[in-house]
């Protein structure tokens, strides 16, 4: 079983989602997790770290150090489900190929539309001539992240369907 599949299966069984997996130099394995309904607290990271340590040992995975953390305020958007979940939130999107000479866009995500397998995501942004709409598929994206919203009053992120 591929490492990402092994970790994702383990996390799903625990009620968590694998956001991102990184293999860094010197044997460092970084796992970013989320829990759509409640978010992540330090106890979640500890619990997942203990479980993954056992699973990786049993599966004889070669690594020196394991880090488990939340995806952070600037969470990456990797899957179609991420775009659905964070519709209404502000995001930075970098496309693989330019559209009208531009690859980088910042705006408000719209809920994906279209038939299964051909869904288009919308991003409302401020263009040169006023408000504009960019439509793209998840495969068109080089990288996408939420724009951090820091609210010291404890309100939820706008668009987060939690």
Swiss-Prot record:
Alphabetical GO biological process terms: ribosomal small subunit assembly; translation
Name of this chain's protein: Ribosome maturation factor RimP
Keyword Repeat: no
Keyword Cytoplasm carried by entry: yes
UniProtKB keywords: Cytoplasm, Ribosome biogenesis
GO cellular component: cytosol
Main location: cytoplasm
Cited function: Required for maturation of 30S ribosomal subunits.
Family: Belongs to the RimP family.
Record localization: Cytoplasm
Gene: rimP
Taxonomy of the source species: Bacteria, Pseudomonadati, Pseudomonadota, Betaproteobacteria, Burkholderiales
